[in-house]
């Protein structure tokens, strides 16, 4: 079995708070029976993840997103679930060499984003793309969500590769000029739990007040209590029960929100090119 590599906690105490899961834990998180007890993440605040700028009335920041601090929060999330923080997550040079990438246009490896919208606490994600093979057309991805944090609402359309290296098989150098079908995907919750949002299904957002209350103001007007850009009004709670959930309709709008302890979710899909993503919030960036 390969040794799991973990990084020492380097973020400030303000960045991410923990509460211990058991009262008999030692300083190293070990309980009286010798087993390591996971720690529980708490909800984050935008003020801890931006430099400069100010927060508006909705808590959205005009400052510069601190990617390093955001990554550290996800590493802490991983440790809270006893999920390994691999060397490839922390050593970019190693990751690029081992995955035979000449650049990061089609980025394999770990990343953290606020979608360039200043609302990381409610509108952000961490992710790693394990594989994305155009020749054989398959894709593997893990999604990391902090407590009550949402992925940007999005859909997938068919298209053609835009970047030259997206068309190139990384292992053989072969150029694969082919149309890309709309991405179809399924998800398996590994740790924590999520609220799943979809435009397919009966609108039932009011039955999930916690999820509704934590939607970003980019999507929902909380004072008027109505959606602005939000299209996905059917909500389900998915738990780590060994059941995979499939996107109900090709091209449909969807996203996830992490539960109260955050979540780690594995995604299975056909080949994916980010140029084929569409977002309800304008000018989303990575």
Predicted region positions:
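Conserved metal-binding segment of the jelly-roll/cupin
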Residues: 146, 235-259
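Bacterial Sec-dependent N-terminal signal peptides
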Residues: 22-32
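Short hydrophobic/aromatic-rich beta-strand segments that constitute the beta-sheet cores
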Residues: 151-153, 194-198, 267
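N-terminal export signals
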Residues: 5-24, 242
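Double-stranded beta-helix
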Residues: 201-234, 253-286
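A short, N-terminal "cap"/entry segment at the start of jelly-roll beta-barrel domains
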Residues: 34-139
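Short, well-structured hydrophobic secondary-structure segments
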Residues: 135-137, 141-158, 163
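Glycine- and acidic-residue-biased ligand/ion/polar-headgroup-sensing regions
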Residues: 146-147, 160-207, 213
């Amino acid at each position: 079995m390969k040794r799991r590599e973990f990084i020492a906690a380097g973020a400030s105490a303000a960045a991410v708070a923990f509460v211990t899961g058991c009262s008999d834990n030692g300083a190293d998180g070990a309980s009286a029976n010798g087993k390591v007890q996971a720690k529980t993440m708490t909800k984050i605040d935008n003020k801890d993840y931006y430099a400069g700028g100010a927060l508006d009335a909705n808590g959205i920041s005009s400052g510069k997103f601190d990617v390093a601090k955001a990554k550290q929060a996800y590493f802490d999330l991983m440790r809270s679930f006893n999920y390994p923080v691999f060397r490839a997550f922390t050593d970019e040079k190693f990751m690029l060499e081992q995955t035979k990438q000449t650049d990061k246009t089609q980025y394999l490896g770990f990343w953290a984003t606020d979608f360039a919208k200043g609302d990381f606490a409610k509108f952000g994600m961490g992710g790693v793309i394990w594989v994305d093979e155009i020749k054989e057309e398959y894709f593997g991805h893990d999604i990391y969500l902090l407590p009550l944090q949402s992925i940007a609402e999005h859909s997938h359309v068919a298209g053609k590769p835009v970047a030259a290296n997206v068309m190139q098989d990384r292992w053989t150098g072969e150029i694969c000029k082919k149309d890309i079908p709309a991405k179809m995907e399924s998800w398996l919750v590994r740790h924590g739990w999520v609220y799943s949002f979809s435009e397919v299904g009966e609108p039932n957002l009011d039955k999930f007040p916690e999820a509704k209350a934590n939607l970003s103001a980019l999507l929902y007007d909380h004072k008027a209590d109505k959606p602005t850009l939000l299209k996905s009004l059917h909500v389900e709670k998915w738990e780590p029960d060994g059941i995979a959930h499939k996107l109900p309709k090709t091209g449909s709008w969807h996203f996830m929100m992490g539960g109260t302890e955050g979540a780690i979710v594995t995604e299975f899909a056909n080949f994916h090119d980010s140029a084929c993503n569409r977002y309800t919030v304008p000018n989303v960036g990575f």
